């Protein structure tokens, strides 16, 4: 795992097309902004896991 330190307003790049910007820090919460092409899905981990679980359930029914 790559670990980076960024300050509010600073950005990191993932590949050529995805940027992640630290928008704010309040207590133990960090607000981030993600710019990515429309064909790149961006989800919070818990939402991604739910989507994957629903896909698995669909495949099990087939």
From Swiss-Prot:
Designated gene of the protein: csrA
Pfam families: CsrA (PF02599)
Primary location class: cytoplasm
Organism the protein comes from: Idiomarina loihiensis (strain ATCC BAA-735 / DSM 15497 / L2-TR)
Transmembrane segments: none
Protein name: Translational regulator CsrA
GO biological-process terms attached to the record: mRNA catabolic process; negative regulation of translational initiation; positive regulation of translational initiation; regulation of carbohydrate metabolic process
Compartments, record wording: Cytoplasm
Role, per record: A key translational regulator that binds mRNA to regulate translation initiation and/or mRNA stability. Mediates global changes in gene expression, shifting from rapid growth to stress survival by linking envelope stress, the stringent response and the catabolite repression systems. Usually binds in the 5'-UTR; binding at or near the Shine-Dalgarno sequence prevents ribosome-binding, repressing translation, binding elsewhere in the 5'-UTR can activate translation and/or stabilize the mRNA. Its function is antagonized by small RNA(s).
């Amino acid at each position: 795992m790559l670990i980076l330190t960024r300050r509010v307003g600073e950005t990191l790049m993932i590949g050529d097309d995805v940027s992640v910007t630290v928008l704010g820090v309040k207590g133990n919460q960090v607000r981030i902004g993600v710019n990515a092409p429309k064909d790149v899905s961006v989800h919070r981990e818990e939402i991604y896991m739910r989507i994957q679980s629903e896909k698995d359930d669909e495949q099990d029914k087939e």
